[in-house]
Design a protein with these regions (language model features):
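N-terminal glycine-/serine-/threonine-rich beta1-alpha1-beta2 phosphate-ribose binding loop
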Residues: 1-108, 123-135
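Predominantly a Rossmann-like dinucleotide-binding segment in NAD(P)-dependent oxidoreductases
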Residues: 18, 22, 132-137, 142-251
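Hydrophobic residues in well-ordered beta-strands that form the structural core
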Residues: 88, 111, 136-138, 167, ...
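ADP-ribose/adenylate-binding Rossmann-like module
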Residues: 105-118
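C-terminal capping/lid region of NAD(P)-dependent oxidoreductase domains
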Residues: 134, 161-165, 393-409, 419-422
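C-terminal glycine/acidic-rich active-site capping loop/insertion
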Residues: 231-250, 258, 262-263, 300-375, ...
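Glycine-rich phosphate/pyrophosphate-binding beta-alpha loops
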Residues: 253, 267, 272-290
């Protein structure tokens, strides 16, 4: 009750930049979190901006001001004195500039994924956060899935033993988004000029938490390889015709990109990026991490989140020598993460099984209590850097590429993730 009263007395004031599919979802969630106001919204698409402004008014909140004069009108929004935080859900190339400007203005920065597309941008985020003392949180929702958090709890309790290997893949058929009004979408244009794992943070976020990356261990180096590129052109020709203006566009991005990472402590991680070939979405009613392959292997057992299966040696039935999978559902009662047990009911009904809500709620809680965000700027830089590093590796015929140490040595003594229960 004390927290609720405090939230009501002093609302967290958030500006939102970009209200397309993701940003409009953020607006809805922010309006549903007690003690949050949205004084300002920015988008160059006036139709989307008007819809977001209408949503704020319909929720009975104070009127929000709109900003739509041009691609950099977010600077006027950030300059306002009545904002505590800024959330960006724009195309990727704007994530870093907006987050940097927000931190320089003394406002918490919450950025959609990835936080950066180049190593220089990664360092801009780190340097700005360190210089200003203002947190920057990557809004990586997949870290907050019920399954991902339960796996974290299993790791922290030692149930899976010492972690040796993880696998994760963003395997999501998004070909329907290649064209927008007959032309290449902004995301498709990224695929024209870049060849690497362009969207690594969904799988690597939970994996980094499970393996204490930047908190006792760090990624050392990676090797990446890309398949040939066929899926996007095939899709355009099949559904829009051989004579479509974009049917012969040369896409640099391979259909499947595979990256292997090794940590300083010797943990290996295999990531895949696969978004341009036919595949159904997860249809498992019990799935907690849809659209991804995710696996966590320890010396005592294995968690296969995308299959909703687990095996712990010696705990599977009366014959401990029998090797067989168990469903993960019974494990939630005993090993469900405290964050989900405390706030899971609030998250019910929101996108991606509620993980979107919990992610944004944790950002708001950090702003409200003026503490560090659970996913901090070092995580944002490290996870996002995989894109640029994988591009380097592929361009060099799959040469090993070292990870920068964005923590500058502090990874050895940094505290574990601090969740905020309120």
């Amino acid at each position: 009750m004390a927290t609720a009263l405090r939230a009501a007395d002093k609302p967290v004031r958030v500006g939102v930049v970009g209200v397309g599919e993701r940003g409009s979802g953020h607006v809805k969630m922010l309006l549903d979190i007690p003690g949050v106001e949205i004084p300002a919204i920015c988008d160059i698409n006036t139709n989307r901006l008007d819809a977001a402004l209408t949503a704020v008014a319909a929720a009975g909140r104070p009127k929000a001001e709109g900003y739509s004069r041009g691609p950099e009108d977010y600077l006027r929004l950030i300059a306002r004195s009545d904002l505590d935080a800024v959330i960006t859900a724009t195309p990727w190339e704007l994530h870093t500039p907006i987050a940097v400007a927000a931190m320089q203005a003394g406002k918490y920065a919450g950025t959609e994924v990835p936080a950066a597309t180049t190593l220089d941008q990664c360092w801009q985020l780190v340097n700005t956060s360190e210089q200003t003392g203002v947190p920057c949180m990557l809004l990586e929702n997949d870290c907050y899935g019920a399954g991902a958090l339960m796996a974290l709890n299993l790791v922290e309790q030692g149930i899976l033993g010492e972690i040796v290997h993880c696998e994760g893949g963003y395997e999501h058929d998004i070909r329907s988004g290649i064209l927008r009004n007959g032309d290449l979408s902004w995301r498709a244009r990224e695929s024209v000029r870049r060849n690497g794992d362009l969207y690594p943070t969904h799988p690597v976020g939970p994996i980094a938490w499970w393996t204490n990356i930047n908190r006792g261990d760090r990624f050392d180096y990676l090797v990446s390889m890309a398949s040939k590129s066929r899926g996007r052109n095939h899709y355009i020709r099949k559904y829009f015709g051989e004579n479509h203006p974009n049917s012969n566009v040369k896409f640099a991005l391979g259909d499947v990109v595979t990256t292997t990472i090794r940590s300083v402590d010797g943990v290996t991680v295999v990531l895949s990026h696969d978004t341009s070939l036919p595949r159904p979405q997860s249809d498992s009613g019990d799935s907690k991490i849809p659209l991804m392959v995710i696996r966590l292997q320890g010396t005592e057992g294995i968690f296969a989140g995308s299959l909703d299966r687990i095996y712990i040696e010696g705990r599977n039935g009366p014959n401990s020598k029998t090797h067989h999978w168990q469903g993960i559902t019974p494990y939630y009662e005993k090993y469900g993460h405290p964050l989900w047990k405390a706030l899971g009911k609030n998250a019910a009904g929101y996108a991606h099984g509620g993980e979107d809500y919990l992610c944004v709620q944790q950002f708001i809680a950090a702003v409200r209590h003026k503490v560090q965000t659970p996913i901090d700027v070092y995580d944002a830089a490290t996870w996002s850097a995989i894109s640029a590093l994988s591009e380097q590796s592929i361009a060099g015929r799959s040469v090993p590429v070292d990870f920068p140490d964005f923590t500058r040595g502090r990874w050895q003594n940094r505290r574990k993730i601090a969740f905020i229960l309120e």
